[in-house]
Swiss-Prot record:
Protein name as catalogued: Phenylalanine--tRNA ligase beta subunit
Taxonomic lineage of the native organism: Archaea, Methanobacteriati, Methanobacteriota, Stenosarchaea group, Methanomicrobia
Needed co-factor(s): Mg(2+)
Gene, per the UniProt record: pheT
Entry GO terms, CC: phenylalanine-tRNA ligase complex
Gene Ontology BP annotations: phenylalanyl-tRNA aminoacylation
C-alpha cells in the first residue's frame, strides 16, 4: 500500500480545517496513520484509491466528508490548440498516450515534492511499476508544439534528467539509475518509445526517463503531462487523477488533441443504484434522500430517482467505482463506520478449517521449506501465454471474457505454470537462481479447483531438481503416486514425467522445452512442476462439469 506524506500547513489550507480534525477523521475514509510528525503526517491508503495519493486528493475528500464542500467537484477544461501524434510503430510496444496541458501552476519546493510523490505512487498503484503506465511531467514553456510520440532508433541520444551529458538510449538502460530499474520494459524491442517536439528535441524516453530539457522547477508555470502505456483505461486514470489534483491546487487544465481525440474531458460517469439493496447490505433503513445526502459527502452528485433509486454522477478520478457495491461502500463510510451497531451472528457454530485452504497451507509450507518464494499471479490472462507460448492446445473448457478491456486479459487461468513463466520474464533482470511457486484457483468447464506450480531458473536447473521437488511435495501431501514418461509439449522430450495417482495423470514435472523458453524470452534452463491438488486425500469432490 502507498504511504503518503501530508504536510499540515498545505493540507489545512486546502481542506479548510485544522490538523487535529484531519488526524482524527482521516482514518474514517479508509486510511491508516503511520507516523505523526511536527510538520506532517504519513498516511497509508489502500491501492484501490489512487485519487487519495496526494494532499490535494485527501483535502478534496476531507472537505466532503466533513461537510465543508459537498457534491461533485466542478471541473472545466478548454482546448489548448496543442496536438500530439502517435506513431503506428508503437502498437506492439506502448500504444496508448494520454495528455493534458496544465497552466498557472504554483510550484514551490513542497508542491514539487508532492507532485513527484503522486507521480511515483501512481506508477506503483496504477502503472504496475511503469509497465501499464508511465507518467511524464514537463515544463511546457521550454518546448515547441506540436508533439510526436514515435518509435525511435535505439541509438538516439539526448541529455537525461539529472545528467549533464548526452547519452544514447541504450547507454541509459545500462548507466542511468532509472534505466537499470526499468530496462526490462523496453530492452527487447527493436525501437524505443520517444516523445519529441516540433523542433525534434527530446522530451521523454518513456517509461524510462524524461529529458533534462523539460525539468520542472519552482519557476515552471505551465506543464505538459504525458501518460504512456499498454492499457488505455489505466493511462486515462493517471491523467484524470493528476489533472484534478492540480486543479485543487489552483491550476487550470486544457485539452490536447491526440490523434484527433480531445483529452482529458474530466467528465463524470452516470450510474443509478438501488436504495433497497444498499440498505439490505449495510443493515440500515435509508430513504433515497438520506442515501443521496451521504453520497454527496463522498463527492458524488446524487439525487433521488423515484422512491427506490438514486441517480449519481461519479467523479472522473474515482477509477475504483466498478460495481454498485463500491457505491454502497462509500455510503457506509459517509454514514460512519463507528456508527454501525455491533451484533452477534444469528447462529452459533463450531468452526473448523475448510479442507481446501488446509491443502493450500500444506503446499505453502512444503514449497517454502524447499526454498521457493510464493508468487501470486493474476487470475486473468490470455491464450497466448496459457497455450501458444507453452506449445499446448487450448483447453476446451477455457472460460473467456465476453467484453475484455485488454488483450492481455481475455480468459480465466486454467493453469499456473505459464503465469510463473511470465513472472520469470518480468524478473529476468534480477540475479539467479530464482525459485517461485504459486498455489491458487484455476477454472475449467466453469468448475473452480486448486493447483500448484513451481519453477526454478538458473544455469544448472534440470530434470533431477524438478523430480526431487515433486517427490517431496507428493510425499508430504500423502499422495501415493507413480511416474510415467510424459508427452507434455511444454517440457523437453526425455526429461519430463507425468505424476499418476489412481491411474489418472494429475501432474507433470521436468525441464521446460527450449522453444517455450524462447517464447518467454528466457536465457537459462527452467525446471518446473505442476500438480492438480484435487488428488490430495481429503480434497472435496468436484461437481460434475456441464
Amino acid at each position: 500500500m502507498a504511504i503518503i506524506t501530508l504536510p499540515y500547513r498545505y493540507l489545512e489550507r486546502l481542506a479548510g480545517t485544522d490538523r487535529q480534525t484531519i488526524i482524527d477523521r482521516v482514518p474514517m475514509i479508509g486510511a491508516d496513520i503511520e507516523r505523526i510528525e511536527d510538520d506532517h503526517v504519513d498516511v497509508e491508503f489502500f491501492p484501490n484509491r489512487p485519487d487519495l495519493y496526494s494532499p490535494e486528493g485527501v483535502a478534496r475528500a476531507m472537505r466532503g466528508f466533513l461537510g465543508i464542500e459537498e457534491g461533485l467537484p466542478a471541473y472545466t477544461v478548454r482546448p489548448s490548440g496543442i496536438a500530439f501524434s502517435v506513431d503506428p510503430g508503437l502498437a506492439d510496444i506502448r500504444p496508448f498516450l494520454g495528455s493534458a496541458v496544465i497552466r498557472n501552476v504554483n510550484l514551490d519546493e513542497e508542491a514539487i515534492e508532492s507532485l513527484m510523490a503522486l507521480q511515483e505512487a501512481l506508477h506503483w498503484a496504477v502503472g504496475r511499476g511503469r509497465g501499464k503506465v508511465a507518467i511524464g511531467v514537463h515544463d511546457l514553456d521550454t518546448v515547441t508544439p506540436p508533439f510526436r510520440y514515435i518509435a525511435s532508433p535505439r541509438n538516439r541520444s539526448f541529455v537525461p534528467l539529472d545528467f549533464e551529458r548526452e547519452m544514447t538510449m541504450e547507454e541509459m538502460l545500462a548507466d542511468h539509475p532509472k534505466g537499470r530499474d526499468y530496462a526490462h520494459l523496453v530492452e527487447n524491442f527493436d525501437t524505443f518509445p520517444l516523445i519529441v517536439d516540433a523542433e525534434n528535441r527530446v522530451l521523454s524516453f518513456p517509461p524510462i526517463i524524461n529529458g533534462e530539457l523539460t525539468r520542472v522547477t519552482a519557476a515552471t508555470k505551465n506543464i505538459l503531462l504525458d501518460c504512456t502505456g499498454t492499457d488505455r483505461r489505466a493511462v486515462m486514470t493517471a491523467v484524470n487523477i493528476i489533472c484534478t489534483a492540480l486543479i485543487e491546487a489552483g491550476a487550470t487544465v486544457e485539452t490536447v488533441t491526440v490523434e484527433g481525440e480531445e483529452m482529458p474531458t474530466l467528465a463524470p460517469a452516470e450510474r443509478v443504484v438501488s436504495v433497497a439493496e444498499c440498505s439490505r447490505l449495510l443493515g440500515l433503513s435509508l430513504t433515497p434522500q438520506e442515501m443521496a445526502g451521504l453520497l454527496r459527502r463522498m463527492r458524488f452528485d446524487a439525487e433521488p430517482d423515484g422512491d427506490s433509486r438514486v441517480r449519481i454522477l461519479v467523479p472522473c478520478y474515482r477509477s475504483d467505482i466498478l460495481h454498485d457495491w463500491d457505491i454502497f461502500e462509500d455510503v457506509a463510510i459517509a454514514y460512519g463506520i463507528e456508527n454501525f451497531d455491533a451484533a452477534l451472528p444469528a447462529t452459533s457454530t463450531v468452526a473448523q478449517e475448510h479442507p481446501i485452504p488446509a491443502v493450500a497451507g500444506a503446499v505453502r509450507s512444503v514449497m517454502t521449506g524447499l526454498g521457493y518464494l510464493e508468487a501470486i499471479p493474476f487470475t486473468l490472462t490470455n491464450e497466448r501465454v496459457l497455450y501458444a507460448n507453452m506449445q499446448r492446445e487450448p483447453a476446451p473448457g477455457t472460460l473467456r471474457l465476453l467484453h475484455p478491456i485488454s488483450e492481455e486479459q481475455t480468459v480465466v487461468r486454467t493453469d499456473l505454470l505459464p503465469l510463473l513463466m511470465e513472472m520469470l520474464l518480468a524478473n529476468k533482470h534480477r540475479e539467479l537462481p530464482q525459485r517461485l511457486f504459486a498455489v491458487g484457483d484455476v477454472v475449467e468447464d466453469c468448475v473452480t479447483y486448486l493447483k500448484v506450480a513451481a519453477v526454478s531458473i538458473h544455469p544448472a536447473a534440470d530434470f533431477s531438481e524438478a523430480y526431487a521437488a515433486a517427490d517431496v511435495l507428493c510425499r508430504e501431501l500423502s499422495l501415493s503416486y507413480t511416474v510415467v514418461e510424459s508427452a507434455d509439449p511444454a517440457f523437453l522430450d526425455g526429461r519430463r514425467g507425468d505424476i499418476v495417482v489412481d491411474g489418472k495423470i494429475v501432474g507433470v514435472f521436468g525441464e521446460i522445452h527450449p522453444a517455450v523458453l524462447g517464447a518467454f524470452d528466457l536465457e537459462h534452463p527452467v525446471a518446473a512442476l505442476a500438480l492438480d491438488l484435487t488428488a490430495v486425500p481429503g480434497y472435496p469432490a468436484l461437481p460434475d462439469t456441464p
